[in-house]
Amino acid sequence: MALLVVLVAVIGPVVSPHSPNALVTLTFAKPSSQFPLGGDFLGRDVLSRVLNGGWLLLLMAAAATAIGIVVGAAAGISAAYLRGARDGIIMRTVDVILAFPQLVFALLLLSLLGPKLWLIVLAVGLSHAPAVARVIRSATLDIAERDYVKVAELQGMRPAKVMAKEILPNLVTPLMVEAGLRLTYSIVIIAGLAFLGFGQPPPAANWGTMINENRIGLQLNPWAVIAPAVLIALLTIGTNTFTDAVARVTIGVDRRPEEAALLDDLGPEQA
């Protein structure tokens, strides 16, 4: 399901029957053989805009997820392994950021720095980092007590090398789960920001923007709103389902017993 939506987003611009910005039909025109999803509020082909409106959303969501995972994992591993004052500083910072809902935190950064696309990606990515850091810290606290970590320390391995070579490889499972969850959240948040006007400037096609632009004509041509909304829903649900399936298969088949126990310790809400 999610793969089908991804396929639509990737090859959509190639197979689009019209330019996404061309005025080719009537305002909120009903679906027809020539325009299967009708027209939007300016008379542009809804199908063409749907086909062109997903690729940048996916790219931005993937980039934001990568930022959140990298920053969050680095913070979580450092806090758990180094402990002491550094652990306190990192986790108190995490607690402060987590006091704000993700969308509010992203909006705060964008209102201060401006709604540029790279800033949207950065803001959403940083909003993911605290939750990732908390999960990875919990997992690292357990791994840091394992024998192979203690052996590396006795051999004189530097802390940075211990974290990179001994701890990080054993966090693959929780990182995979977090990446899937954060990708789902990234899609929803970025689409929501586009709906609120923080996205590609008009007349660029974007699924979130399309919902906002065409909601005034919902009774005239509901497909102008339904089509992008359904694609966003299918993508998020499919991504979440796929992540859950991968986590269960990975824990049950390929991972060592200690990794399975580690993810179980994280709780059902993280698995």
Give, region by region, the residue ranges found by the protein language model.
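Non-cytoplasmic
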Residues: V104-L108, K116-V121, G125, A129, ...
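Transmembrane alpha-helix signature in integral membrane proteins
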Residues: V46-Y81, L235
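Transmembrane alpha-helices
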Residues: W55-V71, A160-G192, T239
